[in-house]
């Protein structure tokens, strides 16, 4: 019997190509989009992911994790900036959400593993799993995956580890995916315009006073 894999699908080309590769290798797969915050792009992501799954004739579902995402990612992000730190919310999201809550959901629902469209590799060395760099070093994402535990690594597949981004796009285009030419996301997903100060101000409902520039000389 084929292994059951739950594929995290953002609606973008990478996760779609990952699902396509797994299906071509005979895995029993299902697509899942995580709804992490309430904005106008989330329904579009769900739509694109579902269209890809329909194209591949695989089941699809979405999972609302807004409360957990706010607790584990957005709130620490705001707190860090207020304390003069520079957070990386993608690392916290991978640790707690994609490879935390989604993996828990997968295992509780009869799946053997999860898969994502990250560019990295997981290799077995002795009795341990090791995270190694992707073939496409310009897209390598090992940095944002570094906190993953042995349990998480053991139950994760990263199908794009040996592909370049161009190869992933080509596979998606060859199968007629609607998102084959979709632009890459560059900014933090919940602050797409990159204006962190305004986001924090609006979220907290407060205005911040300007600080002083100090010359040590």
Model-derived features: where do they sit?
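ATP-dependent adenylation/nucleotidyltransferase module used to activate substrates
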Residues: 1-146, 157, 166-167, 173
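AMP-forming adenylation/ATP pyrophosphatase catalytic core
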Residues: 115-123, 127-217
């Amino acid at each position: 019997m084929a292994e059951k894999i739950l594929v995290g699908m953002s609606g973008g080309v990478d996760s779609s190509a990952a699902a396509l590769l797994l299906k071509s290798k005979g895995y029993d797969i299902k697509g899942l989009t995580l709804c992490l915050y309430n904005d106008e792009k989330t329904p579009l992501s769900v739509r694109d992911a579902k269209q890809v799954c329909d194209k591949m004739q695989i089941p699809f579902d979405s999972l609302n994790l807004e409360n957990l995402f706010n607790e584990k990612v957005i709130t620490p992000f705001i707190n860090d900036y207020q304390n003069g730190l520079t957070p990386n919310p993608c690392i916290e999201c991978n640790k707690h959400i994609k490879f935390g809550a989604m993996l828990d959901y997968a295992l509780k629902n009869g799946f053997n593993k999860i898969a994502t469209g990250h560019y990295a590799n997981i290799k077995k060395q002795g009795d341990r799993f090791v995270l190694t760099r992707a073939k496409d070093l310009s897209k390598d994402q090992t940095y944002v995956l570094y906190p993953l535990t042995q349990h998480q690594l053991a139950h994760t597949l990263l199908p794009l580890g040996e592909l370049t981004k161009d190869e992933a796009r080509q596979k998606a285009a060859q199968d007629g995916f609607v998102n084959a030419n979709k632009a890459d996301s560059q900014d933090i997903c919940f602050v797409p315009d990159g204006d962190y100060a305004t986001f924090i101000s609006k979220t907290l409902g407060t205005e911040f006073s300007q600080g002083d520039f100090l010359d040590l000389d």
